[in-house]
Amino acid sequence: MLKKDKSELTDIEYIVTQENGTEPPFMNEYWNHFAKGIYVDKISGKPLFTSEEKFHSECGWPSFSKALDDDEIIELVDKSFGMLRTEVRSEESNSHLGHVFNDGPKESGGLRYCINSAAIQFIPYEKLEELGYGDLISHFDK
């Protein structure tokens, strides 16, 4: 399983995950990335989302219709910047991931997890076994 010490984070990774920051839309690694695989917490390595739930939302950040495991996600009320939103954090590392909104695809439950690329790492399907995520291969064989 991939893990990263907080001292190894880049400036933007630290700002996003530890200071509740947001990276620029359309200028991040995964906003337009649709390869088959999983997205894990940048710090803990815990699986959070899969490419099966990723969709193109035109918002400029990676968007997912649901989390891989709801127990790995914490949702908190966020009243920053004069808005009322739902913040999404990783349960294991308590890292800020992004926000969840109710404007996702209706056929997939209506949620849009809007996630900062700087908070996640993509693991290609072909590397799941090698990197310790082999138990998730069956998720793609449904």
From Swiss-Prot:
Its EC number is 1.8.4.12. Pfam families: SelR. One of its GO terms (cellular component) is cytoplasm. The gene is msrB. Stereospecific for the R isomer of MetO. Residues 2-125 form the MsrB domain. This is Peptide methionine sulfoxide reductase MsrB. Belongs to the MsrB Met sulfoxide reductase family. It comes from the Bacteria. The active site is at C114 (nucleophile). It comes from Staphylococcus aureus (strain NCTC 8325 / PS 47). PROSITE patterns: MSRB.
